């Protein structure tokens, strides 16, 4: 397990916080974006958290020195989920080495690894009597394995402490390191998630530490390593993307054989983050769910204004496993092969990157498929 290479603490629980940079991006030039303090649509209004179960879980997390992405990322569903006794654990500290322009998690210099964290997480999962748990983390780019060893240890500890509890992980790209990915997968999570976050054009501006094709290839590599593993990703809408770009992202994700997709509305955490380009309506989300499942063959699409990566995660997993409409069984029968499955010798993870957010010409050949949707100006 990688244990060295961290930074001295200070400013946050596990590191030194730094500014994320400018909140303006090129994609918003000429757009009439949503004011920070503008009135939100009715469908985005949620009840403030504070029920008895919420307070119990908050006390439990504090007493065990654990972090949740529900709190750190300012998730709007925290009241609903915590009252239902579910939470998404965030490991590897609470300071991220990357400065994504949409994310509320603190950016800066993380501290040393907490080697006792996996045991505390497993003990808390047992105390909560969970049947399905989601584990995510900050990026730890200063670590040789990106934190993969701690992920694997956490998964293994949960399996031992709570036999029968399924473990879903939402991992960073681990800098595209397939050996680190294998470390996580060898611990046998039930679902492996990695979020694409946005369309290719917006990546350089809003996700400067990530790469569109690195994320696509990372998800495809997981399927190449273990085709039976369910894979999952999420895209945030309302940051300036266009309909054709969403369809293209869906197409690219299905080429990587991704099973589950989540789609949710971007909510601006602060003035230091990029503005909301527009509010996506519930009807639009419902249509994207239909498009994703019926046209592109995703095993399940969870789409809605308040949907986040781990929202209704247990229900998503059970629905796909049970073979409900849009299920993985149907997907596997007529699946679109990932590039790694059809191109001999294709190294899906280690892509050659050109300028930020763009793939060098010739660095990868695209796999053929027959599920591309028509452009917006073409008849459906």
Model-derived features with residue positions:
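Canonical Radical SAM [4Fe-4S] cluster-binding loop centered on the CxxxCxxC motif
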Residues: 34-44, 80-117
């Amino acid at each position: 397990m990688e244990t060295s290479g961290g930074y001295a603490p200070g400013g946050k629980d596990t590191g030194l916080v730094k500014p994320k940079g400018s909140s303006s991006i090129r994609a918003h030039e000429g757009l009439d974006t949503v004011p920070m303090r503008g009135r939100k649509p009715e469908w985005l209004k949620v009840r403030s958290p504070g029920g008895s179960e919420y307070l119990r879980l908050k006390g439990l997390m504090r007493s065990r020195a654990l972090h949740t992405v529900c709190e750190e990322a300012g998730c709007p569903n925290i009241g609903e989920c915590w009252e239902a006794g579910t939470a998404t654990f965030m490991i590897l500290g609470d300071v991220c080495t990357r400065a994504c322009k949409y994310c509320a998690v603190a950016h800066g210099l993380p501290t040393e690894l907490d080697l006792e964290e996996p045991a505390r997480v497993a003990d808390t999962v047992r105390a909560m009597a969970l049947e399905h748990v989601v584990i995510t983390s900050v990026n730890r780019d200063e670590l040789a394995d990106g934190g993969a060893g701690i992920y694997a240890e956490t998964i293994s500890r949960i399996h031992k402490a709570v036999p029968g509890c399924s473990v879903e992980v939402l991992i960073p790209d681990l800098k595209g390191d397939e050996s680190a990915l294998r470390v996580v997968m060898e611990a046998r999570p039930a679902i492996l998630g990695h979020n694409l976050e946005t369309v290719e054009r917006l990546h350089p501006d809003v996700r400067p530490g990530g790469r569109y094709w690195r994320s696509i290839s990372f998800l495809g590599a997981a399927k190449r390593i273990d085709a039976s593993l369910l894979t999952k990703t999420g895209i945030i809408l309302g940051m300036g993307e266009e309909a054709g770009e969403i369809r293209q992202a869906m197409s690219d994700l299905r080429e990587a054989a991704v099973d589950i997709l989540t789609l949710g509305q971007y909510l601006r955490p602060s003035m230091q983050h990029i503005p909301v380009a527009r509010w996506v309506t519930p009807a639009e989300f419902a249509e994207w769910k239909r498009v994703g499942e019926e046209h592109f063959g995703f095993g399940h699409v969870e789409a809605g204004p308040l949907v986040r990566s781990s929202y209704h995660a247990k229900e998503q997993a059970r629905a796909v496993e049970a073979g409900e409409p849009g299920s993985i069984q149907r997907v596997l029968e007529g699946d679109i092969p990932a590039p790694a499955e059809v191109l001999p010798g294709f190294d899906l993870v280690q892509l050659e990157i050109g300028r930020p957010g763009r793939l060098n010409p010739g660095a990868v050949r695209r796999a053929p498929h027959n599920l591309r949707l028509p452009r917006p100006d073409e008849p459906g």
